[in-house]
């Protein structure tokens, strides 16, 4: 610790080597030395006083890492850099990116501007140092002398390693071998220079001209301003060009006057010929005249009133005009570039419009298509010119920023679309991140009828019409407005688009690609089921449209047959009340105890809806009758609440009771509703009226608070405790006294007296409890399966059926690549990986009798060819082959001895028979070859 403190003290210097991170210090963060070591050190020194952890000022400084300095000029961290929080420089060494050092540099630039004007002026017009001008020069030189000393302590960026070099020796050597000589020469006072120079060179401004070396700082300033987003680039460039022009004119004017002033014959000079007594004229008149001739020469106007009179002036004019050629080219080139850049979009727009018009005329396109082409190009130009290039901007951003922007703009819109009602926010966030916003002009086709389903759109603004072509004419079927979705039927069902979608006004649409959509659904199978249900419900509501009705029938047919191995959850089938679909799903090995995010199982839903057949199927396939959801509810409670007596009986026969649920909650609900029948049912089916809710409240507490004497009496009859405390320490007795319920207090006293005398028997709530389920059923677990999806194979879209010849037309639209088919691939993988599919269930999907699940309903077709019956009869499979033979004898009035398959193979074990098999009952005299011949 002492060593660390000493190191900290040694690190502090007058220039704040370890100063706080300022606006320009974003990448000075980690202590990265050339030896590769990294260490965190506190800041100290007058240019950045040290602060402890959690200092608000330091946090404010660190929050400025995103400033324009940190991006435009500071050090970028190298690949693999472990930290970028602070650079520890040596003692007395200053970072070139320190905020205060930059302020110092900006102050020096003001002095450079002064030097740029005064140095040529003194060189041309002032013969010797005088008054305030000489004093000002010396003050400016003093500041630059300080800067020379300061430069020996400023770290520099090594161009090889791109790291700050803070070795004082290397800094001094680099400065000494580069700019030190010129910097020192430009700060020599004029008086001292006149003394050390020969008499012929004792010009006042000779050494002053070396100060122009400082102009490199102005060039750096303009370079930095051009990259600064707070300044307009056009005006920064214009200011730079103006400064260059004025400086050239000023220098040339000073040189012109110097030539005339030093010429032996004053009248033989450019100004002496025009103004013979120019030496007696004021300094202002001479300077203005010089600037006048300089600028007329620069602009090549040349009125002829001023011209060169001697050889010196002619030679200078030659070089000056050569310089003007280069300067003029530089100015014109820069201004042309700035102007052309502003008009290039318009030029490209006109060229594109002309090309599109020529294309339409040359290919004899219909006027409607030509208008759509022109409208689309015009809208694109408008969005570009108004700064609405949203997709270009979003594509240039990182994924996280792009997703955040999309979520902010479109999340609530997508959330309210009917297709995504009830899905998780995670799915909507993923969908919004993949959507692309597009503009469409009025009367433009967005989707064409019968085209391949590649995208669907959500309307942000505007309206579109759904058009169907009938007998060669367009008929508007429906109008969609903001917040609605179009094209989803073709994408989800993988069939050609049903309608042409055409804009009615300027529209902004969100486009979602089918491939991206289905990829997201792959990882959200539960939400995919909700989307399918929403689609089916929406299509059912479109009864007046025959096309929609046909799509509904097709989807319903595929669902009923279960031919697609759809991974539709059991909850989906139960919600629809489709017991046949539920049976198909259970036979495929789906977990009967699979729950949703709230813990609801299919048995919860079936019990709540009172669907006896679904409840029976689920129990036969091993559903846990006492499964508990996140709220503590069990299926039996759902059935009791809805008064489904038949379902209650089925559940009780399957081993259901209320003891595994939150019976305290149940009893409180019954008391709140003052439902004595429900309370009696709770007690009858294993509920404990003394059990408390999560907050410690019992049903008796609730009855006392409500002043319900009848419910309180019923609870007391079944063993409710009047002295049981809730979460706040209140007992029912204390509550009755506190709230002044005299009837309940009297009831409590009489009940206590009867109990003390021993004349009243209080039945235990456990004496009527239903026997628990079998051990095997109680061990059945519930889990929320997350199916592993197979990689989806995106086949090429089929050609629209309506544009194919009749012989090449598909007989039926395939759903293999629809949303149903895509999600079904996940179910196949889940069945393969499911633990119940290995050992727990037979390979066929039928329950294995060895596992105790033989109670499943298996239907088979039996026939007796010896009696002339080949069509067969559908019967339930008995438990043994002997029972099956007896059943056949009754059905066909015949005594069979063997069971064969339709292929002629003899069946020896009933476990080999699958649901839906066709069995043949024959006698020993039957020849199997006859059956093969018939088949």
From Swiss-Prot:
UniProt cross-references to SMART domains, sorted A to Z: ANK, cNMP
**Where along this sequence does the record place binding of a nucleoside 3',5'-cyclic phosphate?**
419-538
Mind telling me which Pfam families this protein's record contains? Answer: Ank_2, cNMP_binding, Ion_trans, KHA
Q: Which Gene3D superfamilies match?
A: 1.10.287.70, Ankyrin repeat-containing domain, Jelly Rolls
Q: Where in the cell is it found?
A: Membrane
Q: Which pairs are disulfide-linked?
A: none
> Where does the record place the KHA domain?
859-935
Biased-composition ranges for Polar residues? 845-854
User: Transmembrane: present as a keyword of the record?
Assistant: yes
Instruction: Kindly state the tissue distribution recorded for this protein.
Output: Expressed in roots and coleoptile of young seedlings.
| Extracellular face of the membrane | 128-136, 200-205, 262-288, 309-312
Which factors induce or repress this protein, as stated in its UniProt record?
A: Down-regulated by salt stress.
Query: Membrane-spanning residues where?
Result: 107-127, 137-157, 179-199, 206-226, 241-261, 313-333
Cellular-component GO terms for this entry: monoatomic ion channel complex
| Region (Disordered) residue spans | 826-854
Q: What is its main location?
A: membrane
Question: Which of UniProt's keywords are assigned here?
Answer: ANK repeat, Ion channel, Ion transport, Membrane, Potassium, Potassium channel, Potassium transport, Repeat, Transmembrane, Transmembrane helix, Transport, Voltage-gated channel
Q: Where are the ANK repeats?
A: 565-594, 598-627, 631-660, 662-691, 695-724, 728-757
Q: Name one GO molecular function term.
A: voltage-gated potassium channel activity
The UniProt record places intramembrane regions at: 289-308
**What is known about its subunit structure?**
The potassium channel is probably a homo- or heterotetrameric complex of pore-forming subunits.
What functional role does this protein have? Highly selective inward-rectifying potassium channel that mediates potassium uptake by plant roots. Assuming opened or closed conformations in response to the voltage difference across the membrane, the channel is activated by hyperpolarization. May be a major salt-sensitive potassium channel in roots.
Family label: Belongs to the potassium channel family. Plant (TC 1.A.1.4) subfamily.
The name this protein goes by in its record: Potassium channel AKT1
Q: Which gene encodes it?
A: AKT1
């Amino acid at each position: 610790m002492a060593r660390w403190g000493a190191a900290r003290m040694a690190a502090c210097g007058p220039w704040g080597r370890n100063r706080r991170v300022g606006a320009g210090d974003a990448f000075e963060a980690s202590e990265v030395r050339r030896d590769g070591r990294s260490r965190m050190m506190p800041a100290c020194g007058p240019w950045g006083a040290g602060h402890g952890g959690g200092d608000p000022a330091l946090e404010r400084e660190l929050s400025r890492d995103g400033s324009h300095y940190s991006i435009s000029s500071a050090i970028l961290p190298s690949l693999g850099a472990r930290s970028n929080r602070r650079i520890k420089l040596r003692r007395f060494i200053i970072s070139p990116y320190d905020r205060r050092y930059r302020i110092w540099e900006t102050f020096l630039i003001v002095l450079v501007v002064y030097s740029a004007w005064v140095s040529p002026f003194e060189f041309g017009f002032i013969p010797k140092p005088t008054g305030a001008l000489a004093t000002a020069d010396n003050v400016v030189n003093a500041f630059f002398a300080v800067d020379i000393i300061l430069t020996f302590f400023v770290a520099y960026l090594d161009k090889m390693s791109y790291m700050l070099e803070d070795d004082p020796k290397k800094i001094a050597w680099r400065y000494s071998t580069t700019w030190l000589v010129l910097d020192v020469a430009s700060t020599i006072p004029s008086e001292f220079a006149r003394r050390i120079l020969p008499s012929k060179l004792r010009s006042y401004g000779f050494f002053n001209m070396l100060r122009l070396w400082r102009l490199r700082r102005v060039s750096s300033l303009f370079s930095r301003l051009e990259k600064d987003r707070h300044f307009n680039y056009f005006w920064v460039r214009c200011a730079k060009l103006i400064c260059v022009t004025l400086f050239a004119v000023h220098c040339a004017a000073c040189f012109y006057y110097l030539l005339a002033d030093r010429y032996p014959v004053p009248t033989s000079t450019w100004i002496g010929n025009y103004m013979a007594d120019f030496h007696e004229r004021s300094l202002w008149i001479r300077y203005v005249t010089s600037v006048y001739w300089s600028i007329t020469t620069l602009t090549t106007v040349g009125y002829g009133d001023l011209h060169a009179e001697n050889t010196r002036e002619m030679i200078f004019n030659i070089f000056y005009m050569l310089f003007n050629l280069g300067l003029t080219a530089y100015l014109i080139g820069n201004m042309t570039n700035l102007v052309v850049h502003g008009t290039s979009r318009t030029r490209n727009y006109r060229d594109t419009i002309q090309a599109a018009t020529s294309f339409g005329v040359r290919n004899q396109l219909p006027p409607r298509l030509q208008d759509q082409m022109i409208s689309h190009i015009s809208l694109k130009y408008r969005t570009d010119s108004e700064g609405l290039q949203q997709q270009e901007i979003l594509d240039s951003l990182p994924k996280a920023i792009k997703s955040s922007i999309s979520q902010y703009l479109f999340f609530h819109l997508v959330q309210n679309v009917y297709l995504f009602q009830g899905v998780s926010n995670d799915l909507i966030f993923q969908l919004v991140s993949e959507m692309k916003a597009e503009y469409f002009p009025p009367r433009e086709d967005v989707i064409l009828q019968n085209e391949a389903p590649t995208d669907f759109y959500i309307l942000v603004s505007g309206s579109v019409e759904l058009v169907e072509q009938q007998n060669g004419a367009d008929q508007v079927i429906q109008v969609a407005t903001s917040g609605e979705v179009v094209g989803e039927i073709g994408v989800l069902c993988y069939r050609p688009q049903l309608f042409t979608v055409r804009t009615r006004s300027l529209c902004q649409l969100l486009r979602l690609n089918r491939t991206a959509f289905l990829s997201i659904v792959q990882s959200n199978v539960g939400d995919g089921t909700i989307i399918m249900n929403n689609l089916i419900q929406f299509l059912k509501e479109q009864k007046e449209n025959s096309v929609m009705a046909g799509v509904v029938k097709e989807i319903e047919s595929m669902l009923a047959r279960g031919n697609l191995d759809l991974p539709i959850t059991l909850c989906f089938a139960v919600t629809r009340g489709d017991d046949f679909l539920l049976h198909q799903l259970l036979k495929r090995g789906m977990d009967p105890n699979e729950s949703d995010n709230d813990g609801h199982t299919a048995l919860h839903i079936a019990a709540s809806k009172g669907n006896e057949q679904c409840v029976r199927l689920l129990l036969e396939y091993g559903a846990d009758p006492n499964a508990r959801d996140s709220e503590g509810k069990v299926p039996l409670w759902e059935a009791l609440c809805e008064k489904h007596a038949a379902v209650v009986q089925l559940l009780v026969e399957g081993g259901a009771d209320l003891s595994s649920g939150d019976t305290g909650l149940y009893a409180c609900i019954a008391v709140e509703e003052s439902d004595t029948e429900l309370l009696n049912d709770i007690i009858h089916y294993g509920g404990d009226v003394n059990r408390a809710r999560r907050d410690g409240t019992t049903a008796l507490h609730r009855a006392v608070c409500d002043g319900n004497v009848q419910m309180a009496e019923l609870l007391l009859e079944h063993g409710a405790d009047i002295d049981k405390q809730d979460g706040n320490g209140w007992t029912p007795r204390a509550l009755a006294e506190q709230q002044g319920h005299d009837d309940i207090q009297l009831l409590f006293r009489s009940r206590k007296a009867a109990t003390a005398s021993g004349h009243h028997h209080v039945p235990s709530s456990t004496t009527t409890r239903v026997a628990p389920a079998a051990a095997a059923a109680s061990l059945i677990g519930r889990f929320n399966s997350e199916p592993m999806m197979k990689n989806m194979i995106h086949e090429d879209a089929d050609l629209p059926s309506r544009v194919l010849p009749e012989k090449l037309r598909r007989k039926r639209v395939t759903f293999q690549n629809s949303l149903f088919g895509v999600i079904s691939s996940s179910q196949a993988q889940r069945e393969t990986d499911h633990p119940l599919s290995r050992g727990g269930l037979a390979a066929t999907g039928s329950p294995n009798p060895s596992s105790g699940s033989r109670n499943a309903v298996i239907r088979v077709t039996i026939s007796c060819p010896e009696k002339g019956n080949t069509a067969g009869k559908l019967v339930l499979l008995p438990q043994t082959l002997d029972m099956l033979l007896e059943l056949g004898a009754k059905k066909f009035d015949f005594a069979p001895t063997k069971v064969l398959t339709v292929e002629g193979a003899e069946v020896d074990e009933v476990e080999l028979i699958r649901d839906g098999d066709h069995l043949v009952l024959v006698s020993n005299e039957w020849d199997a070859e006859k059956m093969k011949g018939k088949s």
